[in-house]
UniProtKB/Swiss-Prot annotation:
Subcellular location: Cytoplasm
Sorted UniProt keywords: Cytoplasm, DNA damage, DNA repair, Hydrolase
Protein name according to UniProt: Uracil-DNA glycosylase
CDD domains cross-referenced by the UniProt entry: UDG-F1-like
Domain of life: Bacteria
Gene: ung
Length: 250
């Protein structure tokens, strides 16, 4: 594949970024806010300056996983910044792309989780996690765009305001939800989740929040909360079953 063939963001065009109907009010409020308009100006300027920006569909997580169907939330930081990697879902890579080290550790943890039976597993021929998203796993990055070869290049430019509202919307729903918070960046959302639940008259315990280190090889085995051995995937399914919900086929 030539560089020019790699899917990328070609313009600021939210009308071409589909989202599920129940996410539309959240997205529209953000897009018309001053923060949303400032982000639009920034992205347009970077594109005009020749920046290569990924992914092609920044809001894809909100298209594949409607709010009413969310069972599990996995929070990432920002999209992969290599050509052809990002597909708009946290930790997921486009079909045919070799899974990065963090995703390899995620698959390794699933394979060793003693609470998961073969019926809870699906074969992964590549690193795409679209099948999870379609089962109700919201794979949400805090920042939804990135420039090629420049991690965190769009951090602090406004996307975080939208993704915080997404987290708050999930924390407000009546359905039981599991939040998997890996690493300090994701765990910073724990207070937001609890505060939102309380504001809605829910006990924080109504949702299950599990924390561990980030699955990156740099931290996956580091105490006191190593990712490898955390058992989060089996615990999530046990919680869903306890609340009358179908488990996730990981």
């Amino acid at each position: 594949m030539f560089a020019s063939d790699v899917p990328r963001l070609t313009g600021w065009a939210p009308e071409r970024w589909p989202v599920a109907a129940d996410w539309r009010p959240v997205v529209d409020r953000f897009l018309t806010s001053e923060t949303g308009r400032a982000l639009e100006r920034f992205v347009r300027a970077r594109l005009a300056g020749g920046a290569v920006i990924y992914p092609q569909q920044p809001l894809r997580a909100l298209a594949l996983t409607p709010l009413a169907q969310v069972k599990v939330v996995i929070l990432g930081q920002d999209p992969y910044h290599g050509p052809g990697q990002a597909e708009g879902l946290a930790f997921s890579v486009a079909p045919g792309v070799r899974p990065p080290p963090s995703l390899c550790n995620i698959f390794r943890e699933i394979a060793r989780d003693p609470l998961l039976s073969p019926g809870n597993l699906i074969p992964h021929g590549d690193g795409s996690l679209v099948a999870w998203a379609r089962q109700g796993v919201l794979l949400l990055n805090s920042c939804l765009t990135v420039e090629e070869g420049q991690p965190a290049s769009h951090a602090g430019r406004g996307w975080e305001a939208l993704t915080d509202e997404v987290v708050k919307a999930v924390a407000s729903i009546d359905n039981p939800v599991v939040f998997l918070l890996w690493g300090a960046h994701a765990q910073a959302k724990q207070r937001l989740i609890a505060a939102t639940a309380r504001q809605g008259g829910r006990a924080a315990a109504d949702h299950l929040v599990l924390t561990a280190n980030h699955p990156s090889p740099l931290s996956a085995r580091r105490p006191p909360l190593p990712f490898l051995g955390c058992g989060h995937f089996g615990l999530a399914n046990a919680y869903l079953l306890q609340h009358g919900c179908a488990p996730i086929a990981w």
